Regions:
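An alpha-helical appendage that flanks or caps ligand/catalytic pockets
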Residues: 1, 40-147
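Internal, glycine-rich beta/alpha segment that forms the wall or movable "lid"
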Residues: 1-27, 44
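Hydrophobic faces of well-ordered beta-strands that scaffold small-molecule active sites
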Residues: 11-14, 31-34, 62-69, 151-153
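Glycine-enriched alpha-helix->loop->beta-strand junction motifs that scaffold or abut catalytic
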Residues: 25-32, 147
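Glycine-rich, proline-tolerant flexible connector loops at the mouths of alpha/beta enzymes
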Residues: 37, 154-162
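C-terminal helical cap(s) of enzyme catalytic domains, especially alpha/beta-barrels
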Residues: 44-52, 160-175
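Bilobed periplasmic-binding protein-like "clamshell/Venus-flytrap" ligand-binding domains
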Residues: 145-156
Length: 175
């Protein structure tokens, strides 16, 4: 058996830099920007992709997906605490110490140094956490700014039930 045999799986370019945007535009392919971990060049990359896009056999006009870390909970406080898992995970990447997804903590400030906080906050700039109403507003702003056709969502939530609940709430927000 050959996975995907007989299907027409579209080719995408996933990038976190301007080069990926230029390549996707030149090849006339859909472009997914990895703003869920490298958001600094997102707006410029999306703009370059749209400006330089050349139609292809696969795609007649630009098609953009942006990535975002999104954690939705019933309360702002619960979402903030759940988000500390992502903050710890990215801090570990900065330190070069990977590991399993850590449980949330009450006091993230005691986990990282000011320099780590600054670096991680920059990496997580396209990350939203909050109640459904908060997330609805933040997503509307993101989608309006990027004019993205699709959204790729990452939810690094330690507790499985909380992760499922987050996606349930996000689905309600997206309706």
């Amino acid at each position: 058996a050959i996975p995907g045999e007989g299907t027409n799986v579209p080719l995408w370019i996933l990038g976190s830099s301007l080069y990926g945007a230029q390549l996707a535009a030149m090849l006339g392919l859909p472009y997914a920007f990895a703003s869920h971990f490298a958001p600094q060049a997102m707006m410029e990359a999306v703009s370059i992709y749209r400006e330089q896009f050349k139609p292809s056999a696969q795609l007649s006009q630009p098609y953009v997906m942006v990535g975002c870390n999104i954690i939705v909970a019933d309360t702002e406080d619960e979402a903030r605490k759940l988000f500390t898992t992502s903050q710890q995970q990215f801090t570990r990447m900065v330190r070069g110490t990977r590991g399993q997804l850590p449980p949330p903590v009450d006091d993230i400030e005691s986990f990282w140094s000011p320099i780590e906080k600054e670096r991680v906050s920059s990496m997580l700039a396209c990350s939203f956490y909050g109640s459904p109403s908060t997330i609805k507003g933040k997503l509307a702003t993101l989608m309006e700014a990027t004019k993205a056709d699709e959204l790729m969502v990452v939810a690094a939530i330690w507790d499985h039930q909380a992760r499922v609940r987050s996606f349930e709430l996000l689905a309600q927000v997206m309706d």
